[in-house]
Amino acid sequence: MYEYIKGTLTHINESYVVIESFGIGYAIMLSERFLVDLRAFMHQEVLIYVHSVIRETEHVLYGFSSRAERECFRLLISFSGIGPKTGLSILNMFPLQELCSIARLENVKAIASVPGIGKKTAEKLMVDLKQKLPTLMPLYLEEPVVPSSTANSSFKEGIGALMNLGFSRLAADRMMTEAVKELSEEASVAELLPIALRKS
């Protein structure tokens, strides 16, 4: 079982990416949202958390931007009637923080809007999600997939501000990294944010 795969992003398809590590190319299935975020890192080193699904005729790797997202995926596919593709669809539509909010508000309609999930399945899913999802949130505050080279407080504050605006952690890291390159590591968060937003 793999914990994560770290290597060079060499190919992006409609539903998967290829990461080359020590001469081996790993095809990893991703959500559309994560695929979009990774496009800015073509031919760069990335780290993707993975979940393996092994069947008689295939071995599929599903990739995630954080350990928390992967554990959420594992929670989702533990429910009867929800397979890996449906689990990935849920995470594509609802980032972890939003999914926690949906569970807290018992918004069955939102979950039922995911292709492949009916109202009854959504109602059953909501009960367990409300109880178990909050335990995953501490994992959400971990390093981004592509660790930033800048560790100053303005950079970290900027990432937090962008995530509050709805950007993923990976996208926020990329935007702030580009803003720092354009200005400097000593720039304040007030100076960096306007430039970072232009990089979205």
From Swiss-Prot:
Q: Which InterPro entries match?
A: DNA_helicase_Holl-junc_RuvA_I, Hlx-hairpin-Hlx_DNA-bd_motif, NA-bd_OB-fold, RuvA, RuvA_2-like, RuvA_C
Spans annotated as Domain I: 1-65
User: What domain of life is recorded for the organism?
Assistant: Bacteria
Position of the signal peptide: none
According to the UniProt entry, its GO molecular function terms are: ATP binding; four-way junction DNA binding; four-way junction helicase activity
Location comes to: Cytoplasm
Q: Name one GO biological process term.
A: SOS response
Region described as Domain II: spans on this chain: 66-144
User: What is one term from the GO cellular component aspect held by the record?
Assistant: Holliday junction resolvase complex
Chief location: cytoplasm
Cite the residue spans of the region called Domain III.
150-200
Keyword DNA repair, does the record have it?
Answer: yes
The ranges of region (Flexible linker) come to: 145-149
| Keyword annotations from UniProtKB, A to Z | Cytoplasm, DNA damage, DNA recombination, DNA repair, DNA-binding
Q: Does the keyword Cytoplasm apply?
A: yes
Query: Per the similarity annotation, which family is this?
Result: Belongs to the RuvA family.
Query: According to its UniProt entry, what is the function of this protein?
Result: The RuvA-RuvB-RuvC complex processes Holliday junction (HJ) DNA during genetic recombination and DNA repair, while the RuvA-RuvB complex plays an important role in the rescue of blocked DNA replication forks via replication fork reversal (RFR). RuvA specifically binds to HJ cruciform DNA, conferring on it an open structure. The RuvB hexamer acts as an ATP-dependent pump, pulling dsDNA into and through the RuvAB complex. HJ branch migration allows RuvC to scan DNA until it finds its consensus sequence, where it cleaves and resolves the cruciform DNA.
Known partners and oligomeric status: Homotetramer. Forms an RuvA(8)-RuvB(12)-Holliday junction (HJ) complex. HJ DNA is sandwiched between 2 RuvA tetramers; dsDNA enters through RuvA and exits via RuvB. An RuvB hexamer assembles on each DNA strand where it exits the tetramer. Each RuvB hexamer is contacted by two RuvA subunits (via domain III) on 2 adjacent RuvB subunits; this complex drives branch migration. In the full resolvosome a probable DNA-RuvA(4)-RuvB(12)-RuvC(2) complex forms which resolves the HJ.
Q: Which NCBIfam families match?
A: ruvA
* Entry comment, domain topic: Has three domains with a flexible linker between the domains II and III and assumes an 'L' shape. Domain III is highly mobile and contacts RuvB.
* Full protein name: Holliday junction branch migration complex subunit RuvA
Question: What species is given as this protein's source?
Answer: Chlamydia trachomatis serovar D (strain ATCC VR-885 / DSM 19411 / UW-3/Cx)
